[in-house]
């Protein structure tokens, strides 16, 4: 009886730990997605790997799946508030997808080097940038750019982002936000809205290919991560769309910095 009791206690403990880990992973990822258009992969994968001892490939697959719904609900929320550039978003999305494939193919030919901490450090510094040098572009300043020029810029930036994503394997959320705000001169809300719109599709492609190659995920963890990330992304997106630009820059900056630090600390545990 004792052995059985111990086993059931262990199982209960495991369930408890799984729920706690997925809750915080989903919270970090959802806030990052809803506020900053950041990929859930940056937060969820390291947590699943560190605390649930999950296979890294599977962890990334689960993280990308969490991204899909979280990005979709965020894109919907930003779109309803007119903070989404669908036309250029589509142009960018197609070029991102195509060049992600090309990038990952080239990466597979070269000796494998990991760029694990690259995206984390970038997340942190992007956070610092939003606090020190907020994005104060407006819808008006955005409409000054001729449509044709904007379309060509979107294509070029999509190629760059896709190539980096495929090559580094890093989620393009950060890259996209950085490029939309600093290179393309997007207003912050529109940048995040367009970023999550694109990410819905890039994450879907990534998730499907992960499971096609790596097999089915651990279902309870999968469901918990997807649900928690979705809820927090929805909350964050609603807040973000109501916020003043100054506030949003600060909140985005703080969240990115915190996530950068947290994920960086995790990478030491492993």
Put a short name on every predicted segment.
Residues 54-62, 87-88, 185-196:
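Membrane-interface alpha-helices at helix entry/exit sites of multi-pass transporters
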Residues 13-18, 22, 65-76, 170-180:
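Hydrophobic, membrane-facing alpha-helical anchors
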Residues 66, 194-210, 220-233:
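A small-residue-rich subset of transmembrane alpha-helices
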Residues 5-31, 45, 49-51, 56, ...:
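Juxtamembrane transmembrane-helix boundary motif
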Residues 35-44, 169-179:
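Transmembrane helix boundary and interhelical junction motifs in multipass membrane proteins
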Residues 30, 60-68, 192-203, 256:
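Transmembrane helix-bundle signature of multi-pass membrane transporters/permeases
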Residues 1-2:
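Extracellular interaction modules
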